[in-house]
Regions:
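C-terminal ends of transmembrane alpha-helices
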Residues: 19-23, 27, 158-172, 197, ...
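Interfacial loop-to-helix transition and helix-capping segments at the boundaries
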Residues: 28-40, 113-128, 166-189, 230-253, ...
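Solvent-exposed interhelical
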Residues: 134-157, 195-221
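Membrane-interfacial loop-to-transmembrane-helix junctions in polytopic alpha-helical membrane proteins
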Residues: 2-5, 25-32, 118, 170-180, ...
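Hydrophobic, aromatic-enriched interface-forming segments
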Residues: 145-201
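Alpha-helical transmembrane segments and terminal signal-anchor/GPI-anchor hydrophobic tails
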Residues: 201-278, 288, 295-297, 302-309
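Membrane-cytosol interface segments of multi-pass membrane proteins
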Residues: 1-162, 278, 299-340
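Helical transmembrane-bundle signal
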Residues: 14-20, 43-50, 77-81, 188-191, ...
Length: 340
């Protein structure tokens, strides 16, 4: 039976990604953005969770997942190439220079090594990173190295936090793409989700037998709260970062809670459907909606209105979701008509 709490959490995570890219105003907006940084690790964890298979079926399933994400990436890339060209043309920017940048060898190298898509749209990096995760996982399964891969989780997460955060205390510095890529931000969380899936039944049985399931539930809730508080504390000392130690603690505790106890909760079917069907598309399309809203708000003169700035992230999420649902509904009706 599918765990609908994970689907609902995907809908919330998609909303948090919108809050990262289209933030609320002031210091409150920055704190919300800090807490929202757990959304991308969550997406990698849930991808790994649903890519765990018993027996030998993994080698059959993973290639189809790679092809699906590859198709999604090429469609998204084509869309944003056209979209960015139109936006730059309307803004009076040099589109010819931008087109040259697209084929610059340094950008192509950054894409191949670090999944960087900044020259088109930065948020698209997630898709090639996920493809890399699936590809590496294919060989992990093929060569039966899953247990060895699990041993790499703390190493990968430690290297992520070192590059993203702690190296600054010792005068070090890494560019965002040097840690926001499949290996450091992606694969560690992907494997964590996969490992949780493999051992979820054993963990729950162990807690039930020892009569500690209630204590574990509250321990995970405390872990989520402590992780969120630590993230805010880290922000107060270091300002904005791509990810914090507190985010890692919070998202792992949240994921464990959803897997072990989420099935017990009554979940909104609408929220679960949004997460299951539309979360990835919201992630991909919301920047385009934000661009249109920015131009319209500037044209009508409300772009500096405090009321509008507070409503803007919610409007971007709502409009993006409404457009996607509209396209899905229209597509279903067209299919029904063709069958008749």
């Amino acid at each position: 039976m599918r765990n609908k709490s994970l689907d609902a959490a995907k809908a919330v995570a998609a909303c948090l990604v919108v809050f990262i890219h289209v933030s609320f105003p002031g210091q409150v907006g920055q704190i919300i953005k800090v807490l929202a940084r757990c959304a991308v690790p969550f997406f990698f964890m849930i991808s790994g969770y649903f890519c765990y298979y018993e027996g030998k079926t993994a080698e059959d399933k993973i290639p189809s997942k790679i092809l699906h994400i590859l198709k999604l990436f090429f469609i998204s890339l084509l869309f944003y190439l056209v979209w960015e060209y139109i936006m730059k043309f309307l803004s009076g920017e040099d589109t010819g220079e931008w087109l040259k940048e697209l084929t610059d060898s340094s950008h192509l190298k950054e894409f191949a090594l670090y999944n960087s898509t900044s020259v088109v749209r930065a948020h698209l990096w997630f898709l090639p990173a996920l493809i890399y995760c699936y590809a590496v996982d294919f060989f992990v399964e093929k060569w039966k190295l899953r247990k060895a891969a699990y041993c790499c989780i703390p190493v990968l997460l430690a290297m992520l936090l070192w590059r993203a955060e702690f190296c600054r205390f010792f005068g070090g510095f890494y560019h965002t793409m040097e840690y926001r890529n499949f290996l450091f931000t992606g694969f560690g969380f992907y494997l964590t989700g996969q490992m949780i899936h493999e051992y979820q039944d054993k963990m729950y049985q162990c807690f039930v037998q020892k009569h500690t399931e209630r204590h574990i539930k509250w321990l995970l809730i405390v872990g989520m709260a402590a992780g969120a508080a630590l993230s805010i504390l880290e922000y107060s000392f270091q300002n904005a970062r791509e990810i914090y130690l507190g985010n890692c603690i919070a998202v792992i505790c949240l994921f464990l809670w959803l897997v072990l106890y989420g099935k017990e909760k009554k979940i909104s079917p609408i929220l679960a459907e949004i997460g299951r069907k539309y979360a990835f598309l919201i992630y991909l399309l919301h920047p385009a909606v934000a661009d249109v809203m920015k131009k319209i708000s500037h044209h009508v003169g409300i772009d500096s209105s405090l009321c509008y700035l507070w409503l803007r992230p919610l409007l971007v999420y709502g409009i993006t979701l409404g457009m996607i649902q509209g396209v899905f509904t229209l597509n279903m009706r067209l299919k029904d008509c063709s069958r008749r």
